[in-house]
Amino acid sequence: MRITASAVSLNVDDVAASAQFLTTHFGFQEKMAADGFAALTRDDAGMGVVFLRRGLDMLPEDQRDDHACGLILAFEVDDLEGELARLQAEGVKITMPLRSEDWGERAFQVRDPNGVIVELLDWNAPGRS
């Protein structure tokens, strides 16, 4: 098998709100959109994000009422503190403050208007706390 692209698809109530949140604050571009659907991409990301409106007929019946929950969109970034400051300046509410984990990850989280958790992270370099 050769994978040529990847995306995560999330069911939300307001597709436009989630799509706008990622385009405005995280630099995604809208690749395709239709009623109840938006596909987003970034030139430097190996994964796209697709938002589907909950209840959409095209979804399998047992998935129509599912809501994006229990998952985290995690993006590793080069300048974690800079991104934190930028998002705060843009008025984005930080829902988990910057913290360091024992396994070397540093991260903070925000939520989009539909409650989708977005985490920005980096990894501690040797000698960095």
For the regions a protein language model found, what residue spans apply to each?
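Conserved active-site tyrosine of GNAT-family acetyltransferases
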Residues: S18-T23, L87, G115
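Vicinal oxygen chelate
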Residues: M1-S6, Q29-A74, L84-R111, D122-S129
